[in-house]
């Protein structure tokens, strides 16, 4: 798996990373796993399933909520992470080191808009920035997530 710096992020909090063999590894962002809380169940897509970009293809559940996972690209599901199936809580321990499934797609074309890691961090801070701006009238503050907005 490549470095998190090469990951592409969807605004729906999936990350995707294309490996040298052309397969696209998919997981969820750290922000998503923190918002979910303790992950207890992962309903994976079906192996060999054809998926369309943006389609809800899997579900991840915690004690607090359930969330759809969307396909960042169109293609075929060619691998499922059996470790996550057996121990879904692994997603909480290492969200950028644990992939959920792999999609076979030779060219990585993402659902608009996708962002690099830095741009994604800015999106995460956006709601806090608006709340803080209204309350204190200042544009540059650190959000509760600890990122400079």
Swiss-Prot record:
Function recorded in the entry: The glycine cleavage system catalyzes the degradation of glycine. The H protein shuttles the methylamine group of glycine from the P protein to the T protein.
Example of a GO biological process term: glycine decarboxylation via glycine cleavage system
NCBIfam families with a match to the protein in the record: PRK01202.1
Family designation: Belongs to the GcvH family.
All copies of domain Lipoyl-binding, residue ranges: 23-104
Cofactor note: Binds 1 lipoyl cofactor covalently.
Residues the record lists as N6-lipoyllysine modifications: 64
Quaternary state and interactors: The glycine cleavage system is composed of four proteins: P, T, L and H.
GO cellular component terms listed in the entry, alphabetical order: cytosol; glycine cleavage complex
Family matches, as PANTHER family: GLYCINE CLEAVAGE SYSTEM H PROTEIN, GLYCINE CLEAVAGE SYSTEM H PROTEIN-RELATED
Sorted UniProt keywords: Lipoyl
UniProt protein name: Glycine cleavage system H protein
Organism per entry: Polynucleobacter necessarius subsp. necessarius (strain STIR1)
Cofactor list: (R)-lipoate
Pfam families per the UniProt record, alphabetical: GCV_H
């Amino acid at each position: 798996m490549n470095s998190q710096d090469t990951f592409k992020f969807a605004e729906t909090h999936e990350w995707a990373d294309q490996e040298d063999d052309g397969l696209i590894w998919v997981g969820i962002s750290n922000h998503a796993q923190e918002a979910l809380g303790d992950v207890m169940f992962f309903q994976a897509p079906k192996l060999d399933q054809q998926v369309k970009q943006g389609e809800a293809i899997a579900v991840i559940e915690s004690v607090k909520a359930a969330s759809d996972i969307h396909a960042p690209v169109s293609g075929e599901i060619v691998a499922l992470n059996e470790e996550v199936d057996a121990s879904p809580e692994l997603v909480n321990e290492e969200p950028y080191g644990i992939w959920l499934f792999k999609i076979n797609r030779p060219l990585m074309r993402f659902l608009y808009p996708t962002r690099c890691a830095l741009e994604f961090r800015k999106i995460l801070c956006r709601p806090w920035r608006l709340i803080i701006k209204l309350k204190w009238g200042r544009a540059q503050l650190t959000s509760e997530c600890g990122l400079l907005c």
